[in-house]
Swiss-Prot record:
It comes from Arabidopsis thaliana (Mouse-ear cress). Induction: Induced by jasmonate (JA) and by Alternaria brassicicola (locally and systemically), but only slightly by ethylene. Strong induction by wounding, cold or drought stress does not require EIN2, whereas induction by NaCl does. Transcripts accumulate in cycloheximide-treated plants, a protein synthesis inhibitor. Seems to not be influenced by exogenous abscisic acid (ABA), and heat stress. PROSITE patterns: AP2_ERF. A motif (EAR-like (transcriptional repression)) lies at residues 211-217. Interacts with SAP18. Residues 1-22 are annotated as: Disordered. Acts as a transcriptional repressor. Binds to the GCC-box pathogenesis-related promoter element. Involved in the regulation of gene expression by stress factors and by components of stress signal transduction pathways, and could also regulate other AtERFs. Contains a slightly degenerated ERF-associated amphiphilic repression (EAR) motif, which may be involved in the activity of transcriptional repression. The gene is ERF4. One of its GO terms (biological process) is negative regulation of ethylene-activated signaling pathway. This is Ethylene-responsive transcription factor 4. InterPro entries: AP2/ERF_dom (IPR001471), AP2/ERF_dom_sf (IPR036955), DNA-bd_dom_sf (IPR016177). Its main location: nucleus.
């Protein structure tokens, strides 16, 4: 008769596979009833400090990491790195950044304004367009080609220059009379003398100035 072999216990087989797959953490021990205990050694007192019992190995490992950072600070050896430790990790020398990331960053950055270098040949002239001037409320006066006086506007400023006036003789006589009467009225002491008389004074003044301004002035006699 062939001997029948004993079948392996399934509970023992599952426990063996679980022990093989289970990750061991620093400062964590598994209890026989399935829970996990965490403890750490105090470097100052040289004693072991009990941290507690947890349901999972990860919880016990995190409790150990917290206690290790309290005792040893940045030199502590932990099971899980913190977010700051992950961000401080440098990229290995053999690996380079992909060109797609660099191109994305370049496109996201704002364009740089390129200012051309100014030379003496292509510099445009500076135009003053402000109405108030350089400052202080002052204004600039535009220079004229030739000063214009009041007598030039009235048509009698070009007599001594040998040039005919731009106005007609009919309009010239009352203008001369008005200017003369206004000047005489300004020198008078009474207020009534400043009134210009256009009726009687015009004939008297035209008789006194019986000159044709369209002709050149007479030559001086020695």
């Amino acid at each position: 008769m062939a001997k029948m072999g004993l079948k392996p216990d399934p509970a023992t087989t599952n426990q063996t596979h679980n022990n093989a797959k289970e990750i061991r953490y620093r400062g964590v021990r598994k209890r026989p009833w399935g829970r996990y205990a965490a403890e750490i050694r105090d470097p100052g007192k040289k004693t072991r400090v009990w941290l507690g019992t947890f349901d999972t190995a990860e919880e016990a490992a995190r409790a150990y990491d917290t206690a290790a950072r309290d005792f040893r600070g940045a030199k502590a050896k932990t099971n899980f790195p913190t977010f700051l430790e992950l961000s401080d990790q440098k990229v290995p020398t053999g690996f380079a950044r992909s060109p797609s990331q660099s191109s994305t960053l370049d496109c996201a950055s704002p364009p740089t304004l390129v200012v051309p270098s100014a030379t003496a040949g292509n510099v445009p002239p500076q135009l003053e367009l402000s109405l108030g001037g350089g400052g202080g409320g002052s204004c600039y006066q535009i220079p004229m080609s030739r000063p214009v006086y009041f007598l030039d506007l009235m048509g009698i400023g070009n007599v001594g220059r040998g040039q005919p006036p731009p106005v007609t003789s009919a309009f010239r006589s009352p203008v001369v009379h008005v200017a003369t009467k206004m000047a005489c009225g300004a020198q008078s002491d009474s207020d009534s003398s400043s009134v210009v008389d256009f009726e009687g004074g015009m004939e008297k003044r035209s008789q006194l100035l019986d000159l044709d301004l369209n002709l050149p002035p007479p030559s001086e006699q020695a």
